[in-house]
Every structure is written in structure tokens, then in C-alpha cells.
């Protein structure tokens, strides 16, 4: 594979904590970001992006309302709605067409760390520092809390499988466990054990067959989601902040403290390592804390602790 730096998105005034891309071809150039500056930004393409590396895209809207760090964002399938999680103990559902907050979700008693949309866009799951996993409808009403077999420490990450027939929730926590839940019943399906430090991120493959998880030790683990079995583990060489699968290739991307690592999942090898070209007198290299792939797999967005989103073009062959 070949990866080339294409430019950056600047507009946040704090760490870029999360990134999400719409999953429809007509919105392939759009991305939504969250930040420690308490806002979300919705980005569109810059017609002049090829003439200036500093303006790959332009913010369409700045979504304001949270009173603390915004930690995560998830998009509806059509890309028209975003749900955000915040350290102000709340979630918010946003209409990206007009920039308005439609609903505020209250129920968590501590910082909310992660959020995800169900495949049919009718339910939302969230996890946070109150150790709770909550399932909501899109109007902000908490339908139930997944309590039996729950995490015994912070819930750091939650994701849905893409299956419409039998959707499951995957969660990771500071108790070193990855848990798989049946959405229909709210029951724990299985514990995926193996991490020796807290779980920082979970992700589910586009076909729903695989789950990957990462931890603070810099280890990514691959699981058979249907069987609940461990398949392999890969070392990134640095603590991993977030992981995501390529939408159309057998690759996995990891945002780490030392840059981006892309793994070939068949060979379990790191095939690409990316580091930002840091300019300035300070020798502090920014840390990659968030990552997202466009729906067509041709663009990789990465968020950093210097408040910048860096954009990479991805092709299969060098």
C-alpha cells in the first residue's frame, strides 16, 4: 500500500479527540471532529485544497453547547446526524444540516467517554467513568442500563457490530476486559480476556465477523466476534489510543503515542508508519489520539494533540 500526506484541517483549539466519517459515497469528503475545546466541527472539502497544504478542508459548522471536553462522536448512516459524548456527563444529538442540538441525553453521573449509533440508527449506546453502559433511543431517553456482568471500572470505548439482524455491542474498559452484549436482550454474551492493561479502543470489521481491541501497553488483539475466540495479537511499539479497520481492505490502523501504524491483518505485520512533519522551535512531537477512514477507504483522517487534523491519501499499491 502507499500513503501520502495530503494536507491538514485547522480550526480546533484543543486536542482532536475523535473523528467520524459518513458511510455514504456522496459524503466521502466529509468528516466530523470533536475536541477538548468543547466543540464539534463538521468539515467539507476546500475547492483550492491542492494549492495549499494548510487548507485541505473547511469547517461547515461549529457545534457548541457542551461545557467540558467532547470525547467521542458517532454519525448516523446517512451522515445527517451526529451524537457526541462529553466530560460534562451528557450526550447531545445534533442535526448536521442546520447545526442545531436536537436532544440532550442525561443519566450518566460522570464523564461520558464513548458513544455509538446502532446499525438501524434507532438506538445509541454510551459508556463512561461511572462504569455504566447505557442504551438510549434517539430522543435522549435511556431505555436500559447494561448492568448484569457490567464492567467494574471505567467504560472507555463502545461500538456496535454492523449486523441489522442480530446486532451486538462491544465495549472495552479499564478492567482490562472486552465485553460483547446482545442488543435485543441486553445480556452479556461473552468476556474477551487477554489484555493486561486497560482497553483504550474497540472496533468491529465492516462485515461484523471480527473485533479488534487495543490497550495502553500498545497491544492490539484480534477476535472472532461470532465465536468469541482470540485470533491473534499485534504490537504497535507504543501505547495505542484508537484503532479502526479499513472499510475495504484487510488492514487495521492504530493511532499511537508515537504516530500511526497500519497493520496487514493477514501477515500481522506493520506495513506503514506515519509521523507528522512537525514544524516549530519546540521539539515536542504531537501525539495521534484519533483516527478515521473515509467510507471508500481512500482517505485517512488523524487527530493530534497539537489541535490539527492531518489527512492522508491511501492507495493499495505503491
From Swiss-Prot:
Gene3D superfamilies: YVTN repeat-like/Quinoprotein amine dehydrogenase
GO-annotated molecular function: mRNA binding; ribosome binding; translation regulator activity
Family: Belongs to the WD repeat G protein beta family. Ribosomal protein RACK1 subfamily.
Name of the protein in its database record: Small ribosomal subunit protein RACK1
Coiled coil spans: none
Coiled coil in keyword set: no
Gene Ontology biological process: apoptotic process; regulation of cytokinesis
Native source organism of the sequence: Trypanosoma brucei brucei
Database matches in PROSITE patterns: WD_REPEATS_1, WD_REPEATS_2, WD_REPEATS_REGION
